[in-house]
């Protein structure tokens, strides 16, 4: 009885076939990058003020002073949600009284924007906010729109694995790409905010399902050494490339419906990939479809110019026949030790996710050009992923994760000390904070997989990554705090990031340790506060095995 990797070892690790699969599966992630963050431009809120109807009998002086001023970032700007009572100032205008000279504006009664709003078109021509007036009393709908997209992501993460196990990796990959692209196209024809949001939930379900299945397909087709780079650099970097394309599209297409139409084009361009990306041979074997699996391996061998054995898979022989004890979610809380570690992991994943998505969603709200800021927010992710990969190869996990979290949280806290006029420095600090948090986020899959025993490893990664989806759902409300105080989101995110950095130091170290197979082995892992070494841990230090991939 042989292992699958042993059977196909003759193919090699990095031939033309593997390079093609690596590139095509990574490229299929690009639409996820801009769909996942498209809401920052689709639901952008431009400057706005109460509309004063042309029919109002006002002098030019009163029309120019019909909206009260408020202080924002040290300067006076027109109020966004109120105006002076129109009937009152119309009477003053008819009497020939001048605002500020004959009438004290501070004593005038105010009213809400009964005639709607005037929206600035300096940044956006139209967004869903301007389409359905999602401001003032309805401004709560903007973060809810984003949160519901991530609710769809959460739902999709639950079903994507089960669907791909049932119907095959390739079928589900392209079906979910079609869902993501098709429902994005349908959003163009939304006639209400409710319709747009419901469709957005479905787009979120397709977005994460496509991402997860592409990840699974790559790890199953590619060899062990290539899986490391694919799971850390390939998928993440191409996601960042898609994220960088978003502000480029949005800069030239400033109408939200046309932007959505443009964002569906790359999804359509992925259709030809169907004829180049094969089904997972591992999945075919699990379905006892040996002939189809052999055909794929033979084509791969031909592409790599390698001779094929007469028999690759023996239909009588079972691959990977080991039977594992079934695990339940309660196993993650079976003992005090594993329960504490699980709770700590849930907090670490959730709050790191809050920091990552809140900073990403807040990028257009920074001073300066919204499109450039969003592009920089995406660009900084590429060196963050590369740095994380390099650090994971040699350095202790808990220390490097804690270090980048301290870095990210510390610079976010420092922003409040920067004068308002030094906005370039503030933007630079935000990007450095994004760098640290993104690096930490990309390390969590590896760290979590190394901590838990084989029995519950996949479940642990699944449950903790679900906590990150919860973090993404609440992240828009951290951005929303900026409506009350410009610095509040950074103070809250910075404080929480530093706290979870401290929490990370209390995890056991996994670098150089043999992966635990049972819960009993996990219980003997050395904790930060303990200076004692168990005999097992000392043995593993003499014969270390390093895992630098999530699977």
From Swiss-Prot:
pH dependence: Optimum pH is 6.5-7.0 for ergothioneine uptake and transport efficiency decreased at more alkaline pHs.
Gene Ontology BP term (one): triglyceride metabolic process
Reported regulation of activity: Allosterically activated by intracellular ATP.
Topology Cytoplasmic: residue spans: 1-20, 163-171, 219-232, 279-337, 393-399, 448-460, 508-551
Pfam families the record matches: Sugar_tr
Residues modified by glycosylation: 57, 64, 91
MF terms (GO), sorted A to Z: acetylcholine transmembrane transporter activity; amino acid transmembrane transporter activity; amino-acid betaine transmembrane transporter activity; ATP binding; carnitine transmembrane transporter activity; PDZ domain binding; quaternary ammonium group transmembrane transporter activity; secondary active organic cation transmembrane transporter activity
Protein name: Solute carrier family 22 member 4
Source organism (scientific name): Homo sapiens
Highest classification ranks of the organism: Eukaryota, Metazoa, Chordata, Craniata, Vertebrata
Gene that this polypeptide is encoded by: SLC22A4
């Amino acid at each position: 009885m042989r292992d699958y990797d042993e059977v196909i070892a003759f193919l090699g690790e990095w031939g033309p076939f593997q390079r093609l699969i690596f590139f095509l599966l990574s490229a299929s992630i690009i639409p996820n990058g801009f769909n996942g963050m498209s809401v920052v431009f689709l639901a952008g809120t431009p400057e706005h003020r109460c509309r004063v109807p042309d029919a109002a009998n006002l002098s030019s002086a009163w029309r120019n002073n019909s909206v009260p001023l408020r202080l924002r970032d040290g300067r006076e700007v027109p109020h966004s949600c109120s105006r002076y009572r129109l009937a009152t100032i119309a009477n003053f205008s008819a009497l020939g009284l001048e605002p500020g000279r004959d009438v004290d504006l501070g004593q005038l009664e105010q009213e809400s924007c009964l005639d709607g709003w005037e929206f600035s078109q300096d940044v956006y021509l139209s967004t869903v906010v301007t389409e359905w007036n999602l401001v003032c009393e309805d401004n709560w709908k903007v973060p809810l729109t984003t949160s519901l997209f991530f609710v769809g992501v959460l739902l999709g993460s639950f079903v994507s694995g089960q669907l791909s196990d049932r119907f095959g990796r390739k079928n589900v990959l392209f079906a979910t790409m079609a869902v993501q692209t098709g429902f994005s196209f349908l959003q163009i024809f939304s006639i209400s905010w409710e319709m747009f949001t419901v469709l957005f939930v479905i787009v979120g379900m397709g977005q994460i399902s496509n991402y997860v299945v592409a990840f699974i397909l790559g790890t199953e087709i590619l060899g062990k050494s290539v899986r490391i780079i694919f799971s850390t650099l390939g998928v993440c970097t191409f996601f960042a490339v898609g994220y960088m394309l978003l502000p480029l599209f949005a800069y030239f297409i400033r109408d939200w419906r046309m932007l959505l139409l443009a964002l569906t084009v790359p999804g359509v361009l992925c259709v030809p990939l169907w004829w180049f990306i094969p089904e997972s041979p591992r999945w075919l074997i699990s379905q006892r479809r040996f002939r189809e699996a052999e055909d794929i391996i033979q084509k791969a061998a031909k592409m790599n110019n390698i001779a094929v054995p007469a028999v690759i898979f023996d239909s009588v022989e079972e691959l990977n026949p080991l039977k594992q004890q079934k695990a339940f979610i309660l196993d993650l809380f079976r003992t005090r030790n594993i329960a504490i570690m699980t709770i700590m992991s849930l907090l670490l994943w959730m709050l790191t996710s809050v920091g990552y998505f809140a900073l990403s969603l807040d990028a257009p709200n920074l001073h300066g050009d919204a499109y450039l800021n969003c592009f920089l927010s995406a660009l900084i992710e590429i060196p963050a992923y590369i740095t994380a990969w390099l650090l994971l190869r040699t350095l202790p996990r808990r220390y490097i994760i804690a270090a980048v979290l301290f870095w990210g949280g510390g610079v976010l806290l420092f922003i409040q000390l920067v004068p308002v006029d030094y906005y370039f420095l503030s933007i630079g600090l935000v990007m450095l904070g994004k760098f640290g948090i993104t690096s930490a986020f990309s390390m969590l899959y590896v760290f979590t997989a190394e901590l838990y025993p084989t029995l519950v490893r996949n479940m642990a990664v699944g449950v903790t990554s679900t906590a990150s989806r919860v973090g993404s759902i609440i992240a828009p409300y951290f951005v929303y705090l900026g409506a009350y105080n410009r610095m509040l989101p950074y103070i809250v995110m910075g404080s929480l990031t530093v706290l979870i950095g401290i929490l990370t130091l209390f995890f056991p170290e996994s670098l150089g340790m043999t992966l635990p197979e049972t819960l009993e082995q996990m219980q003997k892992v050395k904790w930060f506060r303990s200076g004692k070494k168990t005999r097992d841990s000392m043995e593993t230090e003499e014969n270390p095995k390093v895992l630098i991939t999530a699977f």
